[in-house]
């Protein structure tokens, strides 16, 4: 997903997937499904947690999920003000992005173990 140029942090940068915060009363699965639906229109698929960590000093829980879906690519809807473009990438392209300067440092930290597991 390419971040909107209106975003305060990392405007226009490419991220690996959708993201956001849980709303009061949501568990992490509900939050992930809502964020994916809001940012992409994808409302179906199988989620597999690939990382979970607590980020200090914010005491925030970060969790990452891999979504497997047969959702029709023609149905992708980008969330206005959040994202401006998307692309599907292969495992090789994911690893290549992870190793490039374009990968956000926070993404690299969070995905390290997962990337090493799929090499």
Segments and roles (model prediction):
Residues 43-51:
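A short coil-to-beta-strand element that immediately follows conserved catalytic motifs
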Residues 41-43, 72:
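Secondary-structure boundary elements
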Residues 1-34, 38:
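Conserved Nudix-box catalytic region and its N-terminal flanking loop in Nudix hydrolases
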Residues 6, 54-56:
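Short polar/acidic secondary-structure junctions
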């Amino acid at each position: 997903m390419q971040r909107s140029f209106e975003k305060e942090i990392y405007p226009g940068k490419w991220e690996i997937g959708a993201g956001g915060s849980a709303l009061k009363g949501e568990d992490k699965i509900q939050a992930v499904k809502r964020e994916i639906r809001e940012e992409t229109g994808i409302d179906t698929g199988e989620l597999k947690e690939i990382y979970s960590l607590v980020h200090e000093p914010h005491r925030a829980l970060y969790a990452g999920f891999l979504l497997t879906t047969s959702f029709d690519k023609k149905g992708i809807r980008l969330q206005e003000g959040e994202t401006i473009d998307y692309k599907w990438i292969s495992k090789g392209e994911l690893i290549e992005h992870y190793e490039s300067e374009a990968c956000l440092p926070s993404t690299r930290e969070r995905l390290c173990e997962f990337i090493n597991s799929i090499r």
